[in-house]
Every structure is written in C-alpha cells, then in structure tokens.
C-alpha cells in the first residue's frame, strides 16, 4: 500500500491529558489482539461483563460466565503471548505520547459509542481532547465528508464554498486522508478555521498516501488523527473498509460530495444509514460517473437528502442554532479580452488554448496570457492535458 512515512518526530507535540484507566486499556488491547476474537464477539463479552478487565477478575456470576465463555471459545485471549503483545503496545503508546479512548472506561466519542461495532480502543494525536467529543450534549456538531479520489473541479468548487459557509459555525469536519475529496475537505476546513478529525486505516507510524505528510502540521493544529490500528500496522485494503465505520459513526451526518456507484464512499454512506444517521449527497449531472453514486442514494425514497450548499444540510439536520455564514460572492472585474475568452470557454464547457484561439480569433500566445489571468482570478481551472474548465456558478 505504499512507502511508510515515520511520524515519530510529531508525537510529543501534545501532552497526553485524557484520562484512561491503564488496567482497562491493557484488557482491551488483549481483546483487540487475541486470535479468533472479532469485534462482534468482543462487544458481546463486554455487554456481559461491563468492563474488559472483569474477564480477568470476575466479581459476579455474569462476569464468571463471560470468562468461562471466553476461555472456551477464545483461549488465546488469556495466553502469555497475547498479554506480552498488549503490554508492549501500551508501553509504546505511552512513550510516543499518544492519547487513548477506551470504549468501556473513560472518555470515548459519544456518537461512535452508540455503534454496535465501535472500536474497543482508539489511539490519537493532536488536541482533539478540546473538542468535547465524549459529551452527548456538547455544543459542536460533526459532519463526515466523503467522496472519490478522482475529484473533479465541480467537487472542488463545492467544497470551497461549503467550507467557507461553515466558517462561523464551529462545526467539526471528519474525513479520511485520501487524494481527492478527503484531503480537499480537510484543507478547506482548516482554511476556514474549522477543526478536523482525520481517520487513518493504519498505525500512527505513517501517513497514507505518503505525500500528504506535508499537511500534517495543519491537521494537528486544531484537530488531529485517530486510528484503531497499532503502531506498525500497515495500510491494507480491508482496513480502509473497516476504517469507514469510524468516519460514519463519529458524526451526526455524512455528506457524499462526488462518488461513483461503487467504492469506499458508498460503503461509508450505507454504514451511516445502518447507524441511523442522516445521509446527504451533492447532486451532479446524470451522465457523470463521479455523480452516479450520489444520484443513486438521492433517488432512493427517504434515504438521502439533496445538498446544494451548507444551508440545505443545516435545514435537514434541524440545526437552527447554527447559522451558516452568508457570503457575497466576489465577482472579479475582468477586462474585455478576459470576458471574451471566458465567454467562449463557458460555451464549450472545457477547452484548450488552441480551441479558444479559434473561437476568439486571437493568437494562442495572447490567449495563454489571458487564461493565466483568469486562473489567478479563480474563475477557471487548469486540468490535465492542457484543458481549461470554467468555475461552476453556485446554485
């Protein structure tokens, strides 16, 4: 899944100030690493015991029955090797300055805790403790934003406007770190002063994709990274699917910006619905493959809400106390030559400098200079292959 990128130099940037019971954390780590014990069985044992450490120190009949069940079906849970692995990981977490959230004792994200397959323990980096995620009646809201890695200018345009509208709301933005919609959502949220949560599908020893490590200082400035995977666990395809349940579970609402019919974004969308969370999607043209998934969920009766801008999402959520910022869209002043070229580009939808040279009867060299000015004015995008696309007007 790509080259690992060490992150150890960043670990001690923030203090570990979230309380976590050490004995409970060790017990949960044993459950997490024991062979044969899946997340559903682990949740069943915890429901019987109340705490993980009760499996090793039962105090009542229910806990004794749970211990007997675990010893019979999951003997590796009580092995010396499992205990040693858990002790090593806990020592590493402490030495690296990570904080932990345990499902059973201490702080844990309230929304995620309601999910039947919530991770037993989460590791994190960054000042997320200031966001109050473990309080059910906290003031801040969470929005998960997902979408394709192959984001188009349409999706980018939407996210720029959407995050700008959220600037005064204090909403927390949750996403992954993939190319495309994920990283665009994270960076635009940061640009507008919004805290972000980046959900990883691997251990804290790396960033995947590696070239997104350059964004780490921004991501840790007013939010942070979380993962259920141990230090050294590499990114594997199945882990991205498992990670998606954290993205869907952390927030009250999941927003799909652009997505084909199949892929991680659609998995996250359906997970959100299975957790009885609100699902929203951005509409697109019927012929666009990157909008096919969004259109599919919007077409299903009572499944997803159509979102054109932040006000739509807030209305669907009933967040009357959160008013998205209303902004006047700044229209740059263009000279006659720029207006001429932009008009021709909009008529075509997308074009090269050669096309626009023919359409406007101007030399290619002059058109290239005009296009550069229009790009600086942020009224068009330059895309691969020497093509230009006009910026989509807001609805």
What are these model-predicted stretches?
Residues 2-24, 103-395:
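Glycine-biased, small-residue-rich flexible motifs in mid-sequence functional cores and linkers
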Residues 2-107, 377-385, 390-394:
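Short, small/acidic-rich helices and loops at N termini and domain boundaries
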